[in-house]
């Protein structure tokens, strides 16, 4: 029986918190069950609906996730980091299930060549690798991965709310998140849960730095060190 794997991510553009990459593996014969459950792109679902589907799809297939931390994103190209995460996820699935998937479907991002090389290193046949834009809305197995990634990211963000008082969705377009970040910087704090290479940090008066030019204003300078 063939295994199909879907891969998607959540939190790429977030200013606060992790980028979560998820892989969902299911037997080909059970793909129809995902459709029957109403699985679709997580962005089209309410938080409550995502959590409910997360529970239901847990009984249909196997999933695993990788979290990419803000300081990792600040230090390396985000697409390369995602490729490494996808490689680890698929490697874990192969190891756990003991078989190579007959098909791996990935929602397209900016390192397609690197992704294909990484998956072929794992023994995945090139013809078994499908990378498409909007795969999360076209393939239920990728939609399932999208739901897992979003639910896990939301849960991790909830932890940051309790630990740091983070407000809002974590995205730079969210006024609540921007106000929280502004307040943090006004207190002279620089928690590691923020992505300091995002231009929003500079706009909000924080210790922004450029990946290309190095630190424009170091954390030590910002904190008075």
Swiss-Prot record:
Pfam families: RNase_HII. Keywords: Cytoplasm, Endonuclease, Hydrolase, Manganese, Metal-binding, Nuclease. It catalyses: Endonucleolytic cleavage to 5'-phosphomonoester. InterPro entries: RNase_H2_suA, RNase_HII/HIII, RNase_HII/HIII_dom, RNase_HII_arc, RNase_HII_hlx-loop-hlx_cap_dom, RNaseH-like_sf, RNaseH_sf. It is found in: Cytoplasm. Coiled coil: none annotated. Residues 2-210 form the RNase H type-2 domain. GO terms for biological process: DNA replication, removal of RNA primer; mismatch repair. Manganese or magnesium. Binds 1 divalent metal ion per monomer in the absence of substrate. May bind a second metal ion after substrate binding. Its main location: cytoplasm. GO terms for molecular function: manganese ion binding; RNA binding; RNA-DNA hybrid ribonuclease activity. Belongs to the RNase HII family. Endonuclease that specifically degrades the RNA of RNA-DNA hybrids. HAMAP family: RNase_HII_A. This is Ribonuclease HII. It comes from Aeropyrum pernix (strain ATCC 700893 / DSM 11879 / JCM 9820 / NBRC 100138 / K1).
């Amino acid at each position: 029986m063939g295994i199909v794997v879907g891969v998607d991510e959540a939190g790429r553009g977030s200013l606060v918190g992790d980028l979560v990459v998820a892989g969902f593996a299911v037997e080909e014969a059970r793909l129809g069950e995902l459709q029957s459950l109403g699985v679709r792109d997580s962005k089209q679902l309410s938080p409550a609906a995502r959590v409910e589907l997360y529970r239901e799809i847990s009984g249909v297939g196997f999933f695993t996730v990788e979290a990419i931390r803000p300081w990792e994103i600040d230090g390396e190209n985000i697409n390369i980091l995602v490729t490494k995460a996808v490689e680890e996820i698929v490697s874990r699935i192969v190891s756990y299930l003991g078989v190579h998937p007959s098909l791996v479907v990935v929602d397209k991002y900016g390192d397609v060549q690197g992704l294909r090389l990484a998956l072929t290193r794992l023994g995945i046949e090139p013809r078994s690798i499908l990378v498409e834009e909007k795969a999360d809305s076209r393939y239920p197995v990728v939609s399932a991965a999208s739901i897992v990634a979003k639910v896990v990211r939301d849960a991790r963000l909830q932890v940051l709310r309790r630990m740091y008082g983070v407000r809002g969705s974590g995205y730079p377009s969210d006024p609540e998140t921007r106000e929280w970040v502004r307040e943090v910087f006004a207190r002279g704090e620089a928690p590691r849960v923020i992505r300091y290479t995002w231009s929003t940090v500079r706009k909000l008066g924080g210790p922004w730095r450029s990946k290309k030019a190095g630190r424009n204003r170091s954390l030590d300078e910002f904190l008075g060190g």
